[in-house]
């Protein structure tokens, strides 16, 4: 079983058996994961964490893990797959304790393997530490040097040779730095380590008796604090808090670290806040029932649809979404345009999000498995098809082909996020017209000030200075390092 409690870790090999062999292609966790932590003596913290991760499953579908402490030792269980596939009743019943953290992973560039599953685990001078991370650190080169400079065994061992760690795993580097505190407590050590980090991060971590959480000074990823009758909870989104019956207290502030133990809740600010929340949380990443910076994600997406209708009107008979991510924006487009709203696709609920799957082969296979056109709804009609984004164009191309095969007269695609590359994408999807919301329109729909948002995916303007690419330690931002220019256009395409 994929348990971990002593710092030694194993993973499943190609034959399904557990192996200690390292995959040299492994890379660290990326930016769209889900993290959860709970401190609640007397509660079943493993099951609370399980349900919290279940509510955050949309943020990552490749692996899941839970670490639990009973006050004497930390036990970590993690494996590849969905939360419901990794954990069963027997496993959860074996994870007894008063505090826990959990993680669900999505990798954008790294290999999808057991070694990159979280939480990470590490022994310390006075116990152990387990840590979960949502984000990207861009100074891994500096962090690796800092780990190598640690005195004692930490500095003598090559990170690449340690089971469970690779030279590009930023989370393992942070865990190693946190764990080295021979002359101070973990709380004090964390306040030294966190200012060393550059990039986007939301951490939850724990030792045997204390839960910790921290958010980067820009607040790029969301992190929320909640209250239980007998404890505290932190999670990537408030929807996870509501799922387990916790009340929402507030967002963890940018540059803030929380400490939760038997003495209650303590807050430390390790850096001045410079809010730059990721705008793509509003577009796609977050659940529609989440609230970020006091703005309903669902309301933001509906407003994006209204804005799309104002920017790119078209004569049509039906506005239809690409379910489920395009539904709020499609409803907004229909409301603003006066064109009837309807469902033109039926979705197979048992197929994962195609954007989340790591393999291109799986993505292409998933397109036909995921959606089918409702012929009686689309035949003989001019359609406005609303979705939240175009990443590679594969999804939209297959969808448009299905709609035309079902008898659609025209297919007009409307996207509720700005354009990345008009030449590469628009020329290949096969729509009668293609319209993207403007950058200003998207920002206005979020209800946030432009200065408080990170729009680097669309503008190439990052809230933190990027180092030389050769020092990143991994290709963290392979899709956006070229700083694409956002182009607002409505190209008219020929029918295929």
Model-inferred region functions:
Residues 194, 209-210, 245-247, 251, ...:
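PRPP-dependent phosphoribosyltransferase catalytic core
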Residues 167-168, 172-175, 341-352, 429-446:
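A conserved beta-strand->alpha-helix junction
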Residues 230-237, 354-368, 408, 413:
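Flexible glycine/proline-rich, aromatic-decorated loop/lid segments
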Residues 319, 326-333, 337, 341, ...:
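Extended, hydrophobic alpha-helical segments in both membrane/secreted and soluble proteins
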Residues 338-383, 394, 420:
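Short, glycine/charge-rich flexible loops or terminal/linker lids adjacent to PRPP-binding catalytic cores
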Residues 172-184, 323, 331, 335-353:
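Amphipathic alpha-helical
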Residues 2-254, 259-316, 322, 410:
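Conserved short alpha-helical segments that host acidic/polar catalytic motifs at enzyme active sites
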Residues 153-157, 183-184, 313-317, 335-342, ...:
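Secondary-structure transition/capping motifs at alpha-helix termini
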């Amino acid at each position: 079983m994929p348990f971990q409690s002593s710092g030694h870790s194993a993973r499943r090999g190609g034959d399904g058996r557990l192996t200690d062999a390292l995959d040299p292609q492994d890379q660290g966790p990326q930016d769209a994961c889900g993290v959860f932590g709970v401190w609640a003596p007397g509660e079943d913290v493993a099951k609370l964490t399980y349900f919290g991760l279940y509510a955050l499953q949309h943020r990552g579908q490749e692996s899941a893990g839970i670490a639990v402490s009973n006050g004497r030792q930390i036990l970590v269980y993690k494996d590849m797959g969905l939360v419901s596939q990794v954990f069963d009743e027997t496993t959860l019943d074996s994870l007894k304790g008063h505090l826990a953290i959990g993680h669900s992973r999505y990798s954008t560039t790294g290999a999808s393997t057991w070694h990159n599953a979280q939480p990470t685990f590490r022994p310390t001078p006075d116990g152990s530490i387990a840590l979960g991370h949502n984000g990207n650190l861009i100074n891994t080169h500096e962090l690796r040097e800092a780990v190598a400079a640690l005195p004692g065994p930490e500095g003598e061992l090559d990170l690449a040779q340690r089971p469970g760690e690779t030279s590009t795993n930023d989370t393992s580097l942070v865990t190693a730095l946190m764990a080295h505190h021979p002359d101070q407590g973990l709380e004090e050590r964390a306040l030294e380590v966190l200012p060393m980090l550059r990039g986007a991060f939301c951490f939850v971590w724990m030792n045997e008796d204390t839960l910790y959480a921290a958010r980067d000074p820009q607040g790029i990823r969301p992190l929320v604090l909640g209250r239980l009758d007998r404890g505290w909870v932190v999670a990537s989104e408030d929807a996870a808090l509501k799922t387990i019956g916790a009340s929402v207290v507030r967002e963890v502030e940018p540059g803030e670290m929380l400490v939760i133990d038997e003495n209650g809740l303590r807050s430390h600010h390790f850096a001045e806040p410079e809010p730059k929340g990721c705008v793509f949380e509003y577009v796609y990443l977050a659940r529609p029932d989440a609230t970020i910076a006091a703005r309903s994600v669902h309301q933001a997406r509906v407003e994006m649809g209204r804005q799309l209708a104002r920017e790119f009107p078209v004569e049509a008979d039906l506005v239809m979404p690409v379910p489920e991510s395009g539904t709020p924006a499609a409803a907004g487009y229909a409301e603003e345009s006066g064109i009837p709203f309807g469902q033109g696709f039926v979705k197979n609920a048992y197929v994962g999000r195609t954007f989340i799957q790591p393999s291109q082969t799986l993505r292409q296979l998933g397109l036909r498995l995921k959606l089918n056109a409702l012929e009686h709804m689309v035949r003989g009609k001019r359609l406005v098809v609303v979705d939240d984004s175009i990443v590679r164009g594969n999804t939209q191309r297959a969808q448009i082909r299905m709609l035309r095969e079902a008898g659609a007269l025209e297919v007009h695609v409307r996207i509720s996020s700005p354009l990345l590359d008009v030449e590469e994408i628009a020329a290949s999807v096969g729509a009668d017209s293609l319209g993207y919301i403007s950058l200003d329109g998207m920002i206005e729909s979020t209800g946030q000030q432009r200065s408080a948002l990170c729009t680097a995916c669309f503008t190439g303007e990052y809230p933190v200075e990027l180092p030389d690419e050769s020092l990143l330690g991994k290709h963290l931002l392979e899709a956006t390092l070229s700083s694409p220019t956002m182009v607002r256009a409505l190209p008219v395409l020929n029918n295929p």
